[in-house]
Design a protein with these regions (language model features):
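N-terminal localization/anchoring segments of enzymes in phospholipid and broader phosphate metabolism
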Residues: 1-305, 309
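Phosphate-/nucleic-acid-contacting segments
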Residues: 313
Length: 313
């Protein structure tokens, strides 16, 4: 009896073909309407799954298939024509801020990174903008929270942007302590919220701290002990971070203002007036944002461009 019921519910070959064709058509239409571009392997995998197993693949595609968000775009200054630098021209075509001279200081170990991070927080005079995927419930995270709260109590405007997935295990006491001190806290795409659109797997992994729109601390480290000092007798993870100032820091501040305005559904704020620090630059740097809010796969495109431009190896 059960086998007979299953057979009655199973589609015929023609019905399966029709459902598969409609699923593939749905993929083509949504991809065209959104203007999305995928790697050939990813596109082939989606089409094969939709054609062969549409009953499972189509719901997965509708839930997780979207690659990009569509927040309001950033207005960037474009380079003068004829730069003859392929990388600069490529990034300018993507609408990214141009390269600028900066004073760069690298931190190759966690102790140096922690010292640089906390020094920047303590030297802030006007504002601090923080974006991180993880804010740890550990001495490093608690120390960062205390310093941010202290700066806010001293009259510094402090804003903290956390990712909704990375903040799932964050104790509410951290957020309460920050808000009680006057720190503004926002969550990028809260995991269990119905607000907004797009799949929940599109996250904000940016890790940066901008002080007075002039100094930037960034790199691969989240604000958690395992990235700096280690925890539970374990050595810290090997990672790298840096601080720099001037033009690239302003580009990072502009990106944070855009991210914050998107989450809060408001207009981005105006940046502070730039400070002339001529003569302290040590390198030419460029802010290269990537993620679901960028219309292009910026880092991937730059790596491919470098491969095509290679002359010797």
């Amino acid at each position: 009896m059960n086998l007979q019921i299953v057979r009655e519910w199973m589609p015929t070959a023609s019905q399966h073909f029709l459902i598969g064709a409609l699923a593939v058509l749905c993929y083509v239409i949504t991809t065209r309407l959104r203007g999305e571009r995928r790697a050939a392997t990813a596109a082939i995998a989606w089409v094969m799954g939709l054609a062969l197993v549409p009953y499972i693949t189509l719901p997965m595609y509708l839930l997780f298939g979207r690659r990009k968000l569509r927040p309001p775009g950033l207005v960037r200054q474009h380079l003068a024509p004829g730069t003859q630098l392929w990388a600069a021209d490529l990034l300018d075509g993507m609408g990214l801020a141009p390269a600028s001279p900066s004073h760069v200081r690298w931190q190759h170990d966690g102790a140096a990174a922690q010292a640089a991070l906390w020094q920047l927080i303590e030297q802030a005079e006007h504002r601090i903008d923080v974006c991180t995927f993880i804010l740890g419930n550990d001495p490093l995270g608690q120390g960062t929270v205390e310093r941010l709260a202290h700066s806010a109590r001293q009259g510094v405007v402090v804003r903290v942007l956390l990712d909704g997935f990375g903040a799932l295990l964050l104790p509410r006491s951290h957020l309460r302590r920050l808000r009680q001190a006057g720190v503004e806290v926002a969550i990028f795409r809260p995991f269990f919220s119905l607000r907004g659109n797009g799949p929940r797997n599109l996250r904000n992994h940016r890790k940066l701290l901008v002080v007075d729109d002039r100094w930037l601390w960034s790199g691969g480290r989240n604000l958690a002990a395992e990235y700096f000092t280690g925890k539970a007798g374990e050595a810290p993870w090997r990672d790298i971070s840096f601080t720099l100032d001037d033009g690239t820091a302003r580009a990072a501040a502009e990106q944070f203002a855009h991210d914050w305005a998107t989450v809060q559904r408001q207009l981005p704020r105006d940046l502070l007036a730039p400070v002339d620090t001529q003569g302290t630059e040590t390198a030419l740097t460029q802010f290269l944002p990537s993620g679901p809010d960028q219309p292009e796969d910026t880092a991937h495109a730059l790596l491919l461009g470098a491969c095509f431009q290679a002359k010797r190896r």
